[in-house]
Amino acid sequence: EQGYPFVMKFDKSGKVTIAGNNSVSTGGVYKEESSTYDFVQDMSVVLTFDTYNEIFHEFSSPQTDGVGHGGDYEFQMKGMSADKDTIYVMGKKSGIDMRLVRFPMGAQYTDAAGATETVGSWADYFKAIEANTARLFNNKISGYALSSGDETFDVDGLGVGVMALTPVGLSEIEAASRTYYRGIIVNLDNTIRLSSPFK
């Protein structure tokens, strides 16, 4: 499954406001909701979102398959960048490395029409991510390839958030068993992050 960005504001009293714009928990529209958070000790410091937040907890709620989206609501604190703009965490259940990045207020991006826009609100941030995704992964580009060591992979699915990597030159049967899938998330700086390392 693809990665989903959230915007969060933590206050000192334990309240967190979370915003999202995705098909899973917000119906494809921008929404905000407040709940609470805490830091607990569990073999390390853990950030826990300890009251239900519809926008965020939908990803960690089990569905009829017993798994749902496989998301987390508790995160082991792993460290901080030297400039203190990024906090590195790991999902306690999933083991996926994630980042909490300082909100990029004032950052510029190019919208779908090619105009330069500025991130002035949380809603603008989601518009910027959508514009970057549309610009990076559109039907004008015939295909993508990735080289890793001495192997080349055809890359597909970037526009829908799940990257499929298939080694070049395989038969259809071989490709079915050797295609690797990784969820991705598009960043404001036109980079993408994989949900797990590709080796």
Question: What kind of feature is each model-predicted range?
Answer:
Residues 37:
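TRNA-recognition modules of translation machinery and tRNA-sensing kinases, especially anticodon-binding
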Residues 1-32, 40-199:
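Lipid interaction determinants
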